[in-house]
């Protein structure tokens, strides 16, 4: 189980990403459309002024049940431990134990 402070930090990052998403896209478009090197550098400077945590790269995929960051299945949004546990209990629709 992840610490609650780590979970809260991830939520804060998610909010920052949503808040600065439009601004970040506009600045990146300016970088692409810049005709001179000076304009490009100015746009890069604007981009670097934004908060670090507003970049989507800094967000980590976490299990919504436990907060675990490693071994998370995208399809379920759960870590491997919870997928196994819930599958055995029959809580995941369409998941069956394989046998051949």
Swiss-Prot record:
Q: Give the chief site where it resides.
A: plastid
Pfam family of this protein, just one? Answer: Ribosomal_S14
Q: Does the keyword RNA-binding apply?
A: yes
Which InterPro entries does its entry note? Ribosomal_uS14 (IPR001209), Ribosomal_uS14_bac/plastid (IPR023036), Ribosomal_uS14_CS (IPR018271)
Quaternary structure, per UniProt, is: Part of the 30S ribosomal subunit.
Q: Which family does it belong to?
A: Belongs to the universal ribosomal protein uS14 family.
The name on file for this protein is Small ribosomal subunit protein uS14c
The organism named in the record is Cyanidioschyzon merolae (strain NIES-3377 / 10D)
Q: Could you read off the lineage of the organism from its UniProt record?
A: Eukaryota, Rhodophyta, Bangiophyceae, Cyanidiales, Cyanidiaceae
* Gene, per the UniProt record: rps14
